[in-house]
């Protein structure tokens, strides 16, 4: 029996929006550093 290729993600051939996910990653990283700076009393 041949196995059918079943994927939960639609195979449309479109490129993933790397700019979108990179923007969110950089935003979350910036917020993370802001919280860390506040925690270590670098900013008041």
Swiss-Prot record:
Keywords: Membrane, Photosynthesis, Photosystem I, Thylakoid, Transmembrane, Transmembrane helix
Protein localization: Cellular thylakoid membrane
Principal place of residence: membrane
GO cellular component terms, semicolon-separated: photosystem I; plasma membrane-derived thylakoid membrane
A single GO BP: photosynthesis
Transmembrane segments: 23-43
Family: Belongs to the PsaX family.
Record-given protein name: Photosystem I 4.8 kDa protein
Organism of this sequence: Nostoc sp. (strain PCC 7120 / SAG 25.82 / UTEX 2576)
Phylogenetic placement of the source organism: Bacteria, Bacillati, Cyanobacteriota, Cyanophyceae, Nostocales
